[in-house]
Amino acid sequence: KVKDFSCLDQFFAMAFAQLTYRESLRDIEVNLRAQANRLYHMGFRCSTISRNTLANANATRPWQIYADFAQHLIAMARPLYAKEPLGIDLDAVVYAFDASTIDLCLSLHPWAPFRSTKAAIKLHTLLDLHGSIPSFIHITDGKTHEVNVLDDLVLEAGAFYLMDRGYLDFSRLYVIHQAQAFFVTRAKSNTQFRRRYSNPVDRSTTSVICDQTGVLTVFYSSKDYPAPLRRVAVKDETGKRIT
């Protein structure tokens, strides 16, 4: 019964399924029942695992319980890796922000619209590069553009946020600037930028082509981001210019 199946039992069952690559509720049930005499030592306090009980718990219990638990575990783990080297001479906190699309069956997941023939969700993750620990995880349907999730971030002053050009929204990037944080992203090919001055670069020892400070020149873009921007161009191993 669900009432005899605690949230901790549910967590252990789903963690077991994830770590051992179980493919269905029946698969979870069969494998855990095969280890019935070891369940107590694994942390379970229920006497047996039923796929119906697990299915009901997954369907009816609020997901916020496990979201809060995940945040608690993350808060415990982050200090353990805070001093882990990044491979660059930078003491600040560095985050990478990106989204992954996970395809789903449309008939089983009609609540996750994506295309006419299939469903999907997007997993938006802010990764602390000290230890590669996620500090923010947000799930949306597949149609949600990743740039919208920037509004949900709790920005940290002095931190660096690394993003691809899918997050190039100047009004939202200016919010990061106003929070006294920093962002690094790719410029789009049609970005209009006027150089004010250039910083010296050593092309003989680095792949940096230029390091410039300037402003946006398109009317609406300059209104969205009125502060100066830094633009750095580098050459990759194939000789391609990246800005």
Predicted features along the sequence, with ranges:
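Short edge-strand/loop segments of extracellular domains
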Residues: Q35
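Single, function-defining residue in the core of a domain
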Residues: K1-D27, N31, T60-R61, D68-A77, ...
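Major-groove recognition helix of helix-turn-helix-like DNA-binding domains
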Residues: H41-R61
